[in-house]
Regions:
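N-terminal secretory signal peptides that target proteins for export/translocation
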Residues: 1-7
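Bacterial N-terminal signal peptides
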Residues: 9-22
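Conserved "turn/edge" positions that cap or connect secondary-structure elements
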Residues: 23-354
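Cellulosome-associated attachment modules in secreted, modular CAZymes
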Residues: 310-314, 343, 350-412
Length: 412
């Protein structure tokens, strides 16, 4: 806890802090392309400091990238001439996963850390594979690997234990994993269809239900493994983004655009408690996909509309690939009009903190409700405290309490 209750003699100094407290703005950062033709972002660390993805050359060769502190760098060392793609990063930002061409020309699953470099994860009797997601600390990695018969099999790789097939029927891919590595999601691919699954060590593979159509895919999972998002088809081939709150029950259709505006959408990212979902939809009258954010209160919103003020004239966002568990940081790709190319982006959606005079609940009256709100939050620190951080100094302390006390009764 920062500070302590002050003496009345220090009130002037405390109130002065009210005037110089910082405020923070929402930002859209185009990440660059490694001087190549284009780039896409595929994942982001929990604190938004690390972004990974793929950069494409003019000949559409591809290189995995790692972006941190405003700088994009290739994953593999310069001597590496093969292709590479980064699909996931651990929550702590220390482990990157994807696939990379090995010395004999096969694309194989890898993990990479800044300290140890590249480590190949092996296969399941075959030669190829791809790692798609990692647990919070990177000790558990999931994806697909080739079997001896060249089928793709969903796997879970664990530090010290190696790669394990999940036992999903037919061709299968693991697309996501919970923060502790205990819950895995993905899909199986019998001829002509996709069928989503959820896996745990206790229950094995458990198939998820959809809306009666041919294809169901699970694409993202909350850190605790309780909520899954993806898409499901209807019999008329309409595809809607959806949310599974219970793996034994049908999903919730979260597509709130009218069919005349869009009949196709997929969910690709979900926040910590499953109340914010990101993905993309395809406008009925358009060519390119557009990103959406869904909440129970507002339904689907086009990010190009919500964050229009951050987009330069002619720029647009195409898709969302991932977001941080608190919903603050969003990554994907779009068209950067300034450079004239498709680029990976990092969107920081943090609402600016605005210092105020003590009306915490904004009801026009500074009263006991405002005072109690600050008292109950007293000692909390962080960037997203809300209006209880009256002076926006990232700490609820005596300065905030005194601001409310000085204004007590105003507007009532």
């Amino acid at each position: 806890m920062k500070g302590r209750l002050c003496t009345w003699g220090s009130m002037t100094a405390l109130m002065g802090a009210f005037c110089v407290a910082p405020c923070f703005a929402q930002t859209l950062t185009w990440l660059g392309t490694l001087d190549y033709r284009s780039s896409i972002a595929t994942d982001v660390s929990d604190d938004g400091s690390v972004v990974v993805g793929i950069a494409y050359t003019p000949n559409y060769d591809f290189r995995a990238f790692y972006w941190r502190n405003g700088r994009m760098e290739p994953i593999a060392p310069p001597r590496w001439l093969g292709w590479s793609q980064a699909y996931g990063v651990s929550g702590d930002g220390n482990v990157v996963v994807g696939n990379m061409m090995d010395s004999v020309g096969y694309m194989v699953a890898f993990k990479w850390t800044p300290s140890a470099g590249v480590e190949f994860l092996g296969a399941l009797g075959g030669v190829g594979g791809t790692a798609l997601a990692a647990s919070y600390d990177g000790s558990t990695i999931v994806g697909w690997a080739e079997a001896r018969n060249e089928d793709r099999l969903a796997f879970r790789w664990r530090q010290g234990q190696g790669m394990q097939a999940l036992g999903a029927p037919a061709t299968s891919v693991a697309t996501g994993v919970s923060a502790d590595g205990s819950v895995v999601i993905g899909y199986v691919n019998p001829p002509g269809v996709l069928l989503a699954f959820r896996w745990t060590e206790a229950e094995g593979v458990r198939m998820l239900t959809g809306f009666g159509g041919s294809n169901i895919a699970a694409q993202a999972i909350t850190p605790d493994g309780s909520v899954i998002v993806g898409y499901a088809d209807y019999p008329d081939h309409t595809r809607h983004a959806c949310r599974w709150l219970d793996p034994s029950q049908p999903p919730q259709d979260i597509h709130t655009f009218s069919d005349s505006d869009s009949s196709q959408s997929t969910a690709t990212a979900v926040n910590r408690d499953g109340t914010i979902i990101m993905g993309q939809y395809w406008p009925s009258s358009g060519v390119f996909s557009r990103p959406f954010r869904w909440t129970p209160q507002r339904g689907m919103e086009d990010l190009n509309t919500v964050y229009a003020g951050l987009l330069t004239n002619g720029s647009s966002l195409f898709n969302v690939a991932a977001m941080s568990p608190d919903g603050r940081f969003i990554v994907g790709s779009g068209f950067n009009a300034r450079t004239g190319r498709r680029e990976a982006f990092l969107l920081d959606t943090r609402v600016p903190c605005r210092a105020h005079s003590g009306d915490v609940d904004e009801n026009g009256c500074v009263d006991d409700a405002d005072l109690l709100a600050v008292l109950f939050a007293f000692g909390q620190t962080g960037q997203d405290l809300g209006r209880v951080d009256v002076n926006c100094d990232e700490t609820v302390d005596d300065a905030d309490l005194l601001t409310v006390l000085f204004a007590f009764g105003q507007g009532c």
